[in-house]
UniProtKB/Swiss-Prot annotation:
Pfam family membership, one: RNA_pol_Rpb6
Keywords recorded for this protein, A-Z: DNA-directed RNA polymerase, Nucleotidyltransferase, Transcription, Transferase
Record protein name field: DNA-directed RNA polymerase subunit omega
Any GO MF annotation of the entry: DNA-directed RNA polymerase activity
InterPro entries for this protein: DNA-dir_RNA_pol_omega, Pol_omega/Rpo6/RPB6, RPB6/omega-like_sf
Amino acid sequence: MNKRPLIEQALKRVNNRYELVHAAAKLAKDLYETGAESYVTEEGIPLKKTVISINEIAKGRAVILRKE
């Protein structure tokens, strides 16, 4: 599975890589704290919370709030 296109897609929704890392880390932490279920790939491999969070950002399911 090539992760590069997923990251490029997520970068279209944020200003820069650092903001993406920060947002993905916060979302992954929230997923761990709430005990959210892990997604499983078609091959039966469970995805890590960090990959799930980047995927959610890339698909526009996660709202990123910015301090102005």
